[in-house]
UniProtKB/Swiss-Prot annotation:
Binding positions for 5-phospho-alpha-D-ribose 1-diphosphate per the UniProt entry: A128, N129, G130, Q131, A132
Assigned protein family: Belongs to the purine/pyrimidine phosphoribosyltransferase family. Xpt subfamily.
Pfam family, one: Pribosyltran
Protein name: Xanthine phosphoribosyltransferase
GO cellular component entries: cytoplasm
GO MF term list: xanthine phosphoribosyltransferase activity
Length: 197
């Protein structure tokens, strides 16, 4: 998605060899207009997939997932990283490792929110090692829901997350694919949605 790549070039900050800071529009401050365009793009790509629910994990996946759900006219559900007192019913539970935070979190979704046979589009902010996405896939398997696709806002193609998801037979759409960081700049690989630009 050229609009997203341009924004990464303008406001993204490369930290070291493997971190991209995008807190000016995605991971801290949210540019709702950009998120709306991202949501529309995911909805375009998966328009014929029969999506019944959009699922993400808190926190930075919520904005793009919400706009994708709005464009598809379906509910959006986010997996919570901390159980609260109102989550006292049956839970779908798994553990995910965060590459950026360097920690493992237990994530959960109320089992009554995902029904057997639901066709789920998983959306997340970043794809690095694939752990968050695979964790959400595992939650959907527990619910006997079908994952019809995974939409990633930004993918670090130099890490192994993409291959892990493809090896699982998943349909993957990344709107910005980073081939590498070079001299503090982002070098992009062709995005999966290039036909829509």
């Amino acid at each position: 998605m050229k609009l997203l790549e341009d924004r990464i070039n303008t406001d993204g900050q490369v930290l070291g060899q493997d971190i991209l800071k995008v807190d000016r529009f995605l991971t801290h401050q949210v540019d709702y207009q950009l998120m709306k365009e991202i949501g529309k793009r995911f909805a375009q790509v998966y328009a014929d997939a029969g999506v019944t629910k959009v699922v993400t994990i808190e926190a930075s996946g919520i904005a793009p997932a919400l706009y994708a759900a709005e464009s598809l006219n379906v509910p959006m559900i986010f997996a919570k990283k901390a159980k609260n007192v109102t989550m006292n019913d049956d839970l779908l539970i798994t553990e995910v490792y965060s590459f950026t935070k360097k920690l493992t979190s237990t994530v959960q979704i109320s089992s009554k929110l995902i029904e057997e046979g639901d066709k789920v589009l998983i959306i997340d902010d970043f794809l690095a090692n694939g752990q968050a996405a695979l964790g959400l896939v595992h939650l959907m398997e527990q619910a006997k829901a079908e994952v019809v696709g995974l939409g990633m806002v930004i993918e670090k193609s130099f890490q192994d997350g993409r291959q892990k998801l493809l090896d699982q037979g998943m349909k993957l759409t990344s709107l910005a694919r980073i081939e590498k960081f070079e001299d503090g700049k982002v070098i992009f690989a062709p995005a999966d949605d290039i036909a829509f630009d």
